[in-house]
Design a protein with these regions (language model features):
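A composition-driven surface/loop motif
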Residues: 5-631
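N-terminal secretory signal peptides that target proteins for export/translocation
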Residues: 1-2
C-alpha cells in the first residue's frame, strides 16, 4: 500500500555577508520579538523571560509572540517632512535628497511624499538606529535596484497613513558592492515592520517585500504582484492585521531560515488575505501558527489543474507548465501547497477557502487543528502530515481531494469533518492510490511497515470516498463521536480497511455507520467493547439510510452519496438480543437481531462477498455525504 512520492523543491537564497558597520547576529534579531512591550499591549499574554520562540523541534509558542508599541501605527506629527522628485536637491537633519535618491542616515521619523521616475529611498543609518518611514503618497519606480532599500539600521518601520496611496515598482535584481543580492522591491537587511491603514501597491521583478531578519505586519492594505515570492521574512514572519493581496509566480508568504531551528517560522493572528500563487501560498521553513484571519487561497492553478491521477494539466496561474508536460524530476517539480510547514503546523482559528493543486494543509511532522473553518478543494490531500495529525475542533469541509486526511498517526477528538475524495477518505499511513497512469506530481510515500495508529474519540466525521473510506495500516479504534462513511462501489476497496498481520477494527464507543459494497468488507473486531451489526441492504445514490433501535427510536440517519449493497452500524444503544430496523428513504427493508459483539462480521478481518450482494455502479464524482445527526 505505497502512498505518494513527496516532491518538494526548496529554493531559497541565503545571504552570507553584511555591511561591517551593520553586522548583527541572529540573536540580535530575535530580541526584537521578545522584548518587553513599549507603549502597547498584546492579546497573547506576557513575555516569559528567556523562553525561546520555537524549540528546536517544537511548535510556535503564542505566549512569546509580542508586538511592540512602535510596531503599531501612531501619529507622525513630529516627523520630518520630505518631498521627493527627480529634480529635488535638499538636505536636512538625517537625510539627503539628490540625483533621484533619498538617503536616510539617522534615526527618526520621516514623512515622505512625491515621485521618483527612476530612483530609490535608501536607509543607511547607524546599527542602533530606529528609522520610521511614513509613506504619505509616494510613487517610486527603480530600474536598477529596490525602490526602498534598507542597508543598515536596528529596525525600520514603514507606516501607511490613512487615505494614503503608495506605489513601488522595480525592474531587476541588483547586487551591492559586498555581494549582497537585492531581491525585493521593498528590501531590508534588518528587522522590518509595516503598519497603518493606507495602501501600498508593489509590482516586483522578483520578490515583493523581503526582510533578512524579522518581518512584522500590523496593518495596511498591501497589494503585491511578484515574479517570484510575495512576502519573505527570513527569520520569521509575524502578522497581526492588515488586508494583504498577493499574486506571485513563486510563493506567497514565507519564512526561510534553515540554519537555526528556532527561526524560520510564520505566525498570523489576524487580517484578510487573498493569495494566488504558482508555488506555496504560506510556507514556514520550521513551524507555523495561525490563530485568526480570513484566507482566500489558490495555488498552482487550483484543484481543477490536476487530473484524477494527480498530474498537472498545464497552464497554471502563470502558465508554468505546457499542457501534457508534467515534470518528472524533483529538480523541476514545484510545490503548490496552500499552508506548508517543515515541523509543526498549528491552526487554532481563522476562516480558510482553499483551492490548491497540491496539498491544502501540509507538514513534514505534525498538524494540529483545534478551531477554524476550512473549505477545501485540492488536487492532492486535504490535510497531510508525515507524522501526526490531531484534530480536536473546527469545521473542515473537503469538497474535492485525492485523499482527504493523511498521516502516520491520526487522532480525532472533536470538530466537524465532511470529506470527499477520489481515493481514500482518511488514510493512516497506507492504502492503494489506484494510480496506474504514472506518478502524481506531488506524492507523499509512507512506509507501510511503520507502526501507525488511528483513533477517533470524538467529533463528527462524514466521508464520501471512491477508494477506502477509512484506511489504517495499523489498528482503527473508534471510541466516541459520530462516523458515517459512504464507501466505494468497486469491489477493490471498502468503507473501512485495516492493516494486515493481526491488526483490528475496534468499536469501543460512539456511533458508526459504514455503507458501500461487500467486496473488501472489514467489520468491527469481536474484541470490541461496543456491539455492531453488518447486513445487506440496497439503495441508490442520494437515498437516506436510517436505522431504528429496539424501542423504535432512530439511532442514525445518513444520506448516502453512492449506490450501496452493504452496511455496518454500531451504537451504544444496540444490545445483544435487540432487533434493529433498517429503512431506505422511509421504507422498511429488514429487521436484524444483534446476536454478538460483531453480528454478521468476520472478527475484524477481511470479509468475503459471502452473499452480501453484488456491488453497485459507480456513484457520481464530487458528491458530499450529508449526515443527519442521531436523535
Amino acid at each position: 500500500m505505497n502512498k505518494k512520492i513527496l516532491s518538494i523543491i526548496l529554493a531559497s537564497a541565503i545571504l552570507c555577508s553584511s555591511l561591517v558597520s551593520c553586522a548583527r547576529s541572529s540573536g540580535d534579531g530575535a530580541s526584537d520579538s521578545t522584548s518587553k512591550i513599549e507603549g502597547g499591549t498584546t492579546e497573547l499574554g506576557t513575555q516569559i523571560e528567556g523562553a525561546p520562540l520555537v524549540s528546536a523541534a517544537g511548535a510556535v509558542d503564542p505566549t512569546t509572540i509580542e508586538f511592540k508599541g512602535k510596531d503599531i501605527y501612531s501619529d507622525h506629527s513630529d516627523g520630518i517632512n520630505i518631498s521627493i522628485s527627480d529634480s529635488a536637491d535638499s538636505r536636512g537633519a538625517g537625510y539627503t535628497v539628490s540625483g533621484g535618491k533619498l538617503t536616510i542616515t539617522s534615526d527618526g521619523t520621516y514623512v515622505i511624499s512625491g515621485k521618483f521616475s527612476d530612483g530609490q529611498i535608501i536607509v543607511e543609518a547607524p546599527k542602533e538606529a530606529d528609522v520610521r518611514l511614513v509613506l504619505a503618497g509616494v510613487d517610486i519606480y527603480c530600474s536598477y535596484s529596490a525602490p526602498i532599500l534598507v542597508k543598515c539600521a536596528d529596525k525600520v518601520i514603514v507606516s501607511l497613513p490613512e487615505g494614503s496611496e503608495n506605489s513601488l515598482e522595480d525592474k531587476a535584481e541588483s547586487t551591492l558592492s559586498d555581494g549582497t543580492e537585492i531581491t525585493a522591491a521593498l528590501h531590508s537587511r534588518e528587522s522590518l515592520s509595516i503598519n497603518g491603514t493606507g495602501t501600498l501597491n508593489i509590482k516586483a521583478a522578483k520578490d515583493g517585500i523581503t526582510s533578512k531578519d524579522t518581518l512584522k505586519i500590523t496593518g495596511g492594505v498591501i497589494n503585491i504582484e511578484a515574479k517570484d515570492d510575495g512576502i519573505v521574512g527570513k527569520d520569521r514572519v509575524l502578522i497581526k492585521d492588515g488586508k494583504i493581496t498577493v499574486n506571485a509566480v513563486g510563493d506567497g508568504i514565507k519564512s526561510t531560515n534553515s540554519e537555526d531551528a528556532s527561526l524560520g517560522y510564520v505566525y498570523i493572528e489576524g487580517g484578510v488575505f487573498s493569495i494566488t500563487t504558482d508555488g506555496d501560498a504560506i510556507d514556514a521553513q520550521t513551524s507555523m501558527l495561525i490563530s485568526g484571519g480570513e484566507f482566500d487561497i489558490k495555488t498552482g492553478g487550483g484543484s481543477a489543474n490536476v487530473t484524477s491521477s494527480g498530474q498537472m494539466q498545464g497552464g497554471g496561474f502563470f502558465g508554468r507548465y505546457p499542457t501534457g508536460n508534467q515534470p518528472t524530476s524533483s529538480a523541476n517539480t514545484v510545490s503548490a501547497k496552500a499552508l506548508k510547514a517543515g515541523a509543526y503546523l498549528d491552526l487554532t482559528g481563522g476562516s480558510f477557502t482553499i483551492d490548491s493543486a497540491d496539498d491544502a494543509i501540509h507538514t513534514n511532522d505534525t498538524v494540529r487543528i483545534n478551531n477554524g473553518k476550512y473549505a477545501i478543494s485540492t488536487g492532492d490531500d486535504g490535510v497531510h502530515a508525515d507524522k501526526k495529525l490531531e484534530i480536536s475542533g473546527g469545521a473542515i469541509t473537503i469538497a474535492k481531494s485525492y485523499e482527504g486526511l493523511e498521516a502516520q498517526d491520526i487522532m480525532i477528538s472533536g470538530g466537524y469533518m465532511n470529506i470527499t475524495s477520489s481515493d481514500d477518505g482518511i488514510n493512516a499511513a497506507g492504502g492503494s492510490d489506484g494510480n496506474t497512469g504514472g506518478d502524481r506530481m506531488w506524492q507523499d510515500r509512507f512506509n507501510t511497515t511503520q507502526n501507525v495508529s488511528f483513533v477517533i474519540s470524538g467529533g463528527e466525521v462524514y466521508v464520501n470516498a471512491q477508494g477506502d473510506g477509512i484506511d489504517s495500516n495499523g489498528d482503527l479504534t473508534i471510541s466516541g463521536g459520530i462516523v458515517c462513511v459512504s464507501g466505494p462501489t468497486n469491489s477493490g476497496n471498502g468503507y473501512v480497511d485495516i492493516g494486515e498481520n493481526g491488526h483490528g477494527f475496534y468499536m469501543n464507543g460512539g456511533i458508526y455507520l459504514g455503507v458501500g459494497n461487500s467486496g473488501m468488507l472489514v467489520t468491527p473486531s469481536t474484541n470490541s467493547q461496543q456491539n455492531s451489526v453488518t447486513a445487506s441492504v440496497s439503495g441508490k445514490a442520494g437515498s437516506t439510510l436510517s436505522v431504528k433501535g429496539a424501542d423504535g427510536e432512530e439511532l442514525i440517519s445518513f444520506v448516502v452519496a453512492k449506490q450501496y449493497t452493504t452496511f455496518t452500524v454500531s451504537h451504544p444503544n444496540i444490545k445483544i438480543g435487540d432487533k434493529i430496523t433498517v429503512y431506505v428513504d422511509g421504507e422498511k427493508q429488514s429487521e436484524i437481531e444483534c446476536t454478538s459483539v460483531s453480528t454478521g462480521g468476520s472478527a475484524g478481518g477481511m470479509g468475503g462477498p459471502g452473499g452480501m450482494g453484488a456491488p453497485g455502479g459507480m456513484g457520481g464524482p464530487g458528491q458530499k455525504p450529508s449526515g443527519v445527526r442521531p436523535r
